[in-house]
Amino acid sequence: MAVSARAGIVITGTEVLTGRVQDRNGPWIADRLLELGVELAHITICGDRPADIEAQLRFMAEQGVDLIVTSGGLGPTADDMTVEVVARYCGRELVLDDELENRIANILKKLMGRNPAIEPANFDSIRAANRKQAMIPAGSQVIDPVGTAPGLVVPGRPAVMVLPGPPRELQPIWSKAIQTAPVQDAIAGRTTYRQETIRIFGLPESSLADTLRDAEAAIPGFDLVEITTCLRRGEIEMVTRFEPNAAQVYTQLARLLRDRHGHQVYSEDGASVDELVAKLLTGRRIATAESCTAGLLAARLTDRPGSSKYVAGAVVAYSNEAKAQLLGVDPALIEAHGAVSEPVAQAMAAGALQGFGADTATAITGIAGPSGGTPEKPVGTVCFTVLLDDGRTTTRTVRLPGNRSDIRERSTTVAMHLLRRTLSGIPGSP
């Protein structure tokens, strides 16, 4: 594949380095760079010590990147050192930008107006405390802030884009930062790529690996496509990047996957199972009955805006008594088959369907562990039922690997795919 412009990302913040705060900026920036056709060379995370930040900048430059993007360390406190370090690294003096200071002051006034606990008389001291955020490397370009921390672009080889840490402040200014002349100059050598995402469920990674090896041998020009695979929530996400002149190679690859793996390939346009289920539920009303997942499926269904149009309600029936009282499950059924059984899952779904007056119901009952398993029903045994008011039903028992959290999360994925298949009229296991 052709060599493109390359970038490196430096995430700063001791709270991110130590895991107290999850890095959401690195993956987001990486996706935006890839969309632009910019190759991502490295993502690094470092603490707030100036020497560590400068070491990361130097490392990126040594790797030959054209653009460095930093996030974090732009606040007014003593440990916010990114701008000072970038200025020193770029050999530029720190100067006060009067216009920027006034813009920050206006933002502070608005924030103070929303907080009656702050005395107006204290504004001058607050402005002085935030003056640090108006100190910029000489010759840099300011990106207007959403909060009080502006973005900065420092020209050079490599160019340095300095962005705030909070995603709600970083993401809105990205498009302006990327359009600045220094950044456009830095990424001028980028290559135009297409990126396609295929999602697969119910296929072992080893089977996909076998198919890709066969594709490499059978499809001319296979080396023109770049494939990455990721196992997430029990699904395989396969992302393929290629230049437009390799489109035919990708078409042959997608056809091979479709021919070999049939319904296991459930999305060729990147749509998630959550998106597909939401579309299939249009005009319907669903109710859920959950035991071991304790509402995680309902949470996943309602995570999408507009879900109130198709989600009727949910019941978490953890104990046997709750299954009987809330869902009408016959205690004799539980006594005969156990709470984790297909008959009980079917009864739970029927109870949810009737109790909420829904036309679609999904039930989950299982053993998430770490205790509670038996030789006949080990930890990871989970029973599912999807029931529609026209009589269509799908019931499955699976054994899921992993710890308690893994089993619960994967259970919601299995349930979503059973729901997708049942609503789509697709036969067979998920």
From Swiss-Prot:
| A single Gene Ontology CC term | plasma membrane
For this protein, the record's SMART domains field holds:
MoCF_biosynth
Q: Which SUPFAM superfamilies match?
A: CinA-like, Molybdenum cofactor biosynthesis proteins
Q: Which Gene3D superfamilies match?
A: CinA-like (3.90.950.20), MoaB/Mog-like domain (3.40.980.10)
Give the InterPro entries listed for this entry: CinA, CinA-like_C, CinA_C, Competence-induced_CinA, MoaB/Mog-like_dom_sf, MoaB/Mog_dom
UniProt record similarity statement: Belongs to the CinA family.
Q: What is this protein called?
A: CinA-like protein
Name of the gene encoding the protein in the UniProt record? cinA
